[in-house]
Curated annotation (Swiss-Prot):
GO terms for molecular function: toxin activity. It comes from Myrmica rubra (European fire ant). Its main location: secreted. GO terms for biological process: venom-mediated perturbation of biological process. This is U1-myrmicitoxin-Mr1a. It comes from the Eukaryota. The modification Alanine amide is found at residue 10. GO terms for cellular component: extracellular region. Insecticidal toxin that reduces the survival of aphids (A.pisum). In addition, it increases the sensitivity of the aphids to two commonly used chemical insecticides (imidacloprid and methomyl). Does not display any antibacterial or antifungal activity. Keywords: Amidation, Antimicrobial, Secreted, Toxin. Expressed by the venom gland. It is found in: Secreted.
Length: 10
């Protein structure tokens, strides 16, 4: 999973 993508959800 792309960690940068997860930060976008935050």
């Amino acid at each position: 999973i792309d960690p940068k993508l997860l930060e976008s959800l935050a």
